[in-house]
Amino acid sequence: MLATRNTTRVDGADPIADAAGVALAVYPSAAPGTHPAVVTLAPTSDWQAAIAASVLMASPLHAPVLLSGPRTLPAATRQALSLLGPSGSGAVDGAQVIRVGAVPAPRGLRAQTIAGAGPYALAAAIDRLQAALSGRPSPDVVIASAQAPAYAMPAAGWAAESGNPVLFVSRGGVPAATRQALESHGRPGIYVLGPPSVIPDSVLRQLAAYGTVKRVGAPGPAANSVAFAAYRDPPCVYGQPCAHVPGSFGWAIRSPGHGYVLLNASRPLDAAAAAALSGSADFGPQLLVDDPTTLPRAVLDYLLNYATPGYTQEGPTAAVYNHGWVIGDASAISLSVQAEVDQLLQAIPQSTGG
């Protein structure tokens, strides 16, 4: 890891390494109480399933995501599992690992398997498990595009924080597995992540048969992630502080003093790999960078408008503080972008006008 004043980088060369690094940052597993009960093992071959599996980081399992191909565990995943030493959870019959889709069974660990024929069915199966663990289906659901991974990525962090499942649609409509999952929620709030170019209005009209539908998002992966980070339903009252409160949907982050997780938009598995950082510690939304060497204008403006803390005569020790996580090595997000974000998150003197 590489740290600056206000940022920490999980310096993985790929999402597999990033997932291992994040899991060990959230669960250092070096003292009593610092091991996870359960770890989720998600497939590298199915980014949709990996993003959907992020919801298992929410209560009650709080299971970080590790990644694997179908045949053998990658070395980074195998080593992380050994260090994490999950204890097992009675909520899943003592399982230490939740296997999602086509991943191997880790040797020597008790595992429960979630199966499904394709990404839509697998996401629905993950939703069923989360609902069973929680005692009831969630009141809200996130709908993401199965064909536009960069637009779906921010849903992973929110699922880990909120327990709201991520279900998928195509540009052509709502698959049967997704329809059945929505029916099980009993007319939930349905939040469609992405602009009409990604999920057409015709799909929203189909979704309206299953609940109250609202769209959140913007054109471009970076702007879309910013729109999701700032969103709240019901809307915040103009001129009053905005925050996520019980009964509302969305991060509603429009003030200093928060965490942020920066992801490369071309690495959708990083969204699942980093989801545990949104479901613990700083509880920050995932913001996307579409060029490793440049902080997108949408993210820059968002941080300038809302993130930079100011302090007055009380001094900096009375300020609120931010923290940014940067996911991936310098080929994913450059050191110059990390340094720029570090500066944007730094508390600065604020003029009192006197």
Language-model-detected regions and their locations in the chain:
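Extracellular glycan-binding segments that recognize GlcNAc-based cell-wall polysaccharides
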Residues: 1-354
